[in-house]
């Protein structure tokens, strides 16, 4: 039987993979805010159910069956986020936490209605696709992390990793959201970026810049900024 707890572990493994992390027990303890013994017990159950493999180096990988369940849950999460944003008008930086609470309560019938209304394609309010992408896959689409942006160039925000609500609110207050135009003006010795956004001049640390995917803007117009 697939319990809510098992679904959460499988989805966390898939999401951590999509952010380029090597998934080990400590990764899951951090992502799910649980203890190391709790992770060990959960992994034993998932392994017994044929949903994960734990390699000799400690890395945790989804089996084909585990990956199918994780993909199904991430699609449901994606649809709920889009429903909250596109239909109910909830702010983009709030929908992830709400979808986390709702995703296990959605019936197959309701999910099919969401699919019919919204479609399987399309990006969530954070700019991410329903099929979670690895960093390699994003780079193949011409994206790069804001942390690697070149000073003097203009970019568009393509997607933002969505788990950190405080970071999302911080970015929103500074005009950094999916679709926003950025002009990178400089990089300090500690890799802090200085930007101009629609909200004005912004300084952004490397840890935040590594959560934001961008693409090069097609023209050279700068954001309309507030000075």
Task: Annotate each language-model stretch with its function.
Residues 19-29:
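Short acidic, hydrophobic short linear motifs in intrinsically disordered regions
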Residues 37, 93:
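Key DNA-contact positions within bacterial/archaeal DNA-binding proteins
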Residues 43-44:
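Short, hydrophobic-biased segments on the C-terminal half of alpha helices
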Residues 47-55:
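A short, conserved structural fragment
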Residues 58-77:
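Basic, amphipathic "hinge/linker" alpha-helix immediately C-terminal to the N-terminal HTH DNA-binding motif
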Residues 103-213:
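Mid-protein regulatory/catalytic core that forms ligand/cofactor-binding pockets
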């Amino acid at each position: 039987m697939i319990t809510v707890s098992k679904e959460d572990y499988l989805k966390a493994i898939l999401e951590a993979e999509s952010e380029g992390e090597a998934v080990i027990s400590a990764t899951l303890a951090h992502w799910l805010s649980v203890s190391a013994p709790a992770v060990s017990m959960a992994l034993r159950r998932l392994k017994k159910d044929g949903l994960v493999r734990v390699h000799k180096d400690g890395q945790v990988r989804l089996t084909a069956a585990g990956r199918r369940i994780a993909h199904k849950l991430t699609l449901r999460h994606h649809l709920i986020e889009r429903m909250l944003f596109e239909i109910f008008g909830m702010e983009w930086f709030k929908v992830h936490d709400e979808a986390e609470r709702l995703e296990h309560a959605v019936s197959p019938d309701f999910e099919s209605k969401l699919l019919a209304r919204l479609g399987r394609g399309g990006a969530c309010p954070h700019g991410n696709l329903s099929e979670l992408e690895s960093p390699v896959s994003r780079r193949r689409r011409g994206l790069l992390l804001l942390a690697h942006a070149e000073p003097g160039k203009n970019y568009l925000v393509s997607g933002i990793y969505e788990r950190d609500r405080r970071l999302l609110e911080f970015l929103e207050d500074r005009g950094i959201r999916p679709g926003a135009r950025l002009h990178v003006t400089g990089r300090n010795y500690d890799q802090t970026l200085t930007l101009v956004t629609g909200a004005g001049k912004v300084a952004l640390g490397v840890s935040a810049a590594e959560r934001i995917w961008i693409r090069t803007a097609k023209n050279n117009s700068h954001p309309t900024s507030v000075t």
